[in-house]
């Protein structure tokens, strides 16, 4: 496993993340790629992307039931990436995403 690359100094999570399995698409540099989200919160996500996603990439993440969400990759190690949404999800949006994940 490679070394974690971080866009900024690590700080503890302020929001709990829920475990999910959502196969979807992430787009960066105008290139859509497959990604499997493995956890999700109102502020961000962690996923596995076979192609990898460069640190600090501006991304659009297609969340079933919500459509595309804009954000930025905050850390990356191998195929795993973590990102933060530009605009946090509200409770109703997070509930919709969770319902889609377990439908």
Language model features with spans:
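Structured alpha-helical
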Residues: 1-103
């Amino acid at each position: 496993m490679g070394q974690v690359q971080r866009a900024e100094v690590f700080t503890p999570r302020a929001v709990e993340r829920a475990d999910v399995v959502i196969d979807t698409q992430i787009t960066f540099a105008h290139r859509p790629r497959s990604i499997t989200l493995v956890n999700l919160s109102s502020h961000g996500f962690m996923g596995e992307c076979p192609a990898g996603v460069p640190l600090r990439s501006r991304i659009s993440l297609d969340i079933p039931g919500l459509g595309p969400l804009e954000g930025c990759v905050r850390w990356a190690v191998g195929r795993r990436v973590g990102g933060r949404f530009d605009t946090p999800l509200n409770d109703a949006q997070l509930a919709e995403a969770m319902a889609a994940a377990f439908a």
